[in-house]
From Swiss-Prot:
Pfam families: AA_kinase (PF00696). NCBIfam families: pyrH_arch. The keyword Cytoplasm applies. Pathway: Pyrimidine metabolism; CTP biosynthesis via de novo pathway; UDP from UMP (UMPK route): step 1/1. The gene is pyrH. It is found in: Cytoplasm. Catalyzes the reversible phosphorylation of UMP to UDP. Homohexamer. It comes from Methanospirillum hungatei JF-1 (strain ATCC 27890 / DSM 864 / NBRC 100397 / JF-1). This is Uridylate kinase. Belongs to the UMP kinase family. Signal peptide: none annotated. The lineage of its organism: Archaea, Methanobacteriati, Methanobacteriota, Stenosarchaea group, Methanomicrobia.
Length: 236
């Protein structure tokens, strides 16, 4: 059975508390888990950023702000576990080792942040390595990796394929510009480079696209691999 690790942005799952995107994900993740060993790492999204910003206004240190962010990711993850019901392992796991043990139940394993200073993308990248994942999918608010921020630069071009070293160059270049949000952080990219597990960065706002990609192997996004080979269809 193939192993899939998803990094699901908090802003994708909960763009707003009054406009949740959880319900469409329930049936999709449940169907995916019937054919795959599935791990989902949930981010904090805008809510985490708001809490962190407020903490900083009180001159809280960065470690404290990180802990606040982790709490929000786990709150989002807990909400997803509750929504998935019997399809999910009943607790939000708090370590990679616990995730491996929870997977023995055959349920969807959900986690949030675990370490101050580390994004949930990095958590998911390490989890992909620990589980020997067949594919690591980063579900974001953009449809792939671009040469520049497509929301600010109309000339930005999307990469269809690239290797981890090329992705690292793009991320480093974009992070050097103040105020620019990159699709993935440097630590996560370095983990992908180290473990060599294929990474797909794609738009997560419509979960049907995720299911279609896994079923057909066709996708709109950026595939990052060492050898340029398409990992789809995943080996059964």
């Amino acid at each position: 059975m193939p192993t899939i690790v998803l990094s699901l942005g908090g802003s994708i799952l909960l763009p707003d508390i009054d406009r949740p995107n959880i319900k469409p994900y329930i049936s999709v993740l449940t169907r995916i888990s019937a054919k795959n060993r599935l791990f989902v790492v949930v981010g904090g999204g805008g809510t985490a950023r708001q809490y962190i910003s407020l903490a900083r206004s009180f001159e809280a240190d960065e470690a404290f702000s990180d802990e606040l962010g982790i709490m929000v990711t786990r709150l989002n993850a807990t909400l997803l576990v509750g929504a998935l019901g019997q399809a999910a392992y009943p607790c939000v796991v708090t370590s990679h080792t616990e995730a491996l043990c929870a997977a023995e139940t055959g349920k969807i394993v959900v986690m949030g942040g675990i370490t101050p200073g580390q994004t949930t993308d990095a958590v998911a990248a390490v989890l992909a390595e620990r589980t020997g994942a067949d594919i690591f999918i980063n579900l974001t608010a953009v449809d792939g990796i671009y040469s520049a921020d497509p929301r600010k630069d109309p000339a930005a071009k999307r990469f269809e394929t690239m290797n981890p070293a090329e992705l690292l160059d793009v991320v480093i270049g974009q992070q050097a510009v103040a105020g620019v949000n990159t699709v993935m952080d440097i630590v996560a990219v370095k983990m992908v480079e180290r473990c060599g597990i294929p990474l797909l960065v794609m738009d997560g706002r419509d979960p049907a696209l995720l299911e279609s990609t896994l079923e057909t192997g066709r996708f709109v996004g950026t595939l990052v691999t060492r050898n340029g080979k398409n990992p789809f269809p995943l080996k059964k």
